[in-house]
């Protein structure tokens, strides 16, 4: 199955505490989760690791968000959009369903 959301796509969050925020997908996991730049920031308590020269303390980092909770952002319409697939010149391409433009 082809992925509707891929790395480096600009997405908008549909639900949750970050609803309405936009960001770029940095990583896509096979279990249906994505990491989005600047979205779903959590605070982790990390222990110091003297052997690696790592200081401990509170570290803010991005957590994964369910792929169903984000939608690809269409810059032409300035809205969230759905993704479709079609074949052009023998290649499978993704397109925005609202204006049939290739992503």
UniProtKB/Swiss-Prot annotation:
GO terms for cellular component: ribonucleoprotein complex; ribosome. Signal peptide: none annotated. GO terms for molecular function: rRNA binding; structural constituent of ribosome. Transmembrane segments: none annotated. The keyword Transcription does not apply. Keywords: Ribonucleoprotein, Ribosomal protein, RNA-binding, rRNA-binding. GO terms for biological process: translation. Belongs to the universal ribosomal protein uL24 family. One of two assembly initiator proteins, it binds directly to the 5'-end of the 23S rRNA, where it nucleates assembly of the 50S subunit. Part of the 50S ribosomal subunit. This is Large ribosomal subunit protein uL24. It comes from Haemophilus influenzae (strain PittEE). The lineage of its organism: Bacteria, Pseudomonadati, Pseudomonadota, Gammaproteobacteria, Pasteurellales. The gene is rplX.
């Amino acid at each position: 199955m082809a992925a509707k959301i891929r790395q480096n796509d600009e997405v908008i969050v549909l639900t949750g505490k970050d609803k309405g925020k936009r960001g770029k997908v940095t990583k896509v996991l096979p279990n249906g989760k994505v990491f989005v730049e600047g979205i779903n920031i959590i605070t982790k308590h990390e222990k110091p690791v003297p052997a690696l020269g790592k200081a401990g303390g509170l570290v803010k980092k991005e957590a994964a968000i369910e792929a169903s909770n984000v939608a690809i952002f269409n810059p032409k319409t300035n809205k969230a959009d759905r993704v479709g697939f079609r074949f052009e010149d023998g290649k499978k391409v993704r397109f925005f369903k609202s204006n049939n433009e290739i992503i």
